[in-house]
Amino acid sequence: MKEETIFFFKEDTQYQLRQRAEIRTWLNTIAKKEKYSILELNYIFCSDEYLLQMNRDFLDHDYYTDIITFDNSEVKGKIEGDIFISIDRVKDNAQLQHSTVKDELHRVLAHGLLHLTGYKDKTTKEKEMMRAKEDASLSLRKF
């Protein structure tokens, strides 16, 4: 699968993603590990306020979040989706987790992709599995 099927955009933020080619390769590796391929995956980096409004409009939730994932897939095993990530939340969460912004962002990038492969994070057990999958995904990075 061509790696140009993963796109990065920004809304209401000046954030510039570095190492795009390496990140695309890594995300494709995660998908392949889960026996999925990526047809089209859009990551949209945005502000807290932008994502809060989306959370209100689309999910009827009135709180800040770091990520919202929309699954547009029509065929099992073929990923199509839009993932909105609040750079403000990522930066704050990195501090809270005593992590770097880069590592926290990569965790969130993987988290959204893992949702599109079927992993959930509502229950304690699901959260534990998601965290383990995020950790495994981070260990696949070669950059």
UniProtKB/Swiss-Prot annotation:
The EC code for this enzyme is 3.1.-.-
* Family matches, as InterPro entries: MetalPrtase_cat_dom_sf_prd (IPR023091), YbeY (IPR002036)
- Enzyme group, top EC level? hydrolase
Q: From which residue to which does the signal peptide run? A: none
Q: How is the cofactor bound?
A: Binds 1 zinc ion.
Q: What is this protein called?
A: Endoribonuclease YbeY
Q: Which UniProt keywords apply?
A: Cytoplasm, Endonuclease, Hydrolase, Metal-binding, Nuclease, Ribosome biogenesis, rRNA processing, Zinc
NCBIfam families annotated for this entry?
Answer: rRNA maturation RNase YbeY
Query: Where would you find the membrane-spanning parts of this chain?
Result: none
Q: Which cofactor does it need?
A: Zn(2+)
Give an example GO molecular function.
RNA endonuclease activity
GO CC, alphabetical: cytoplasm
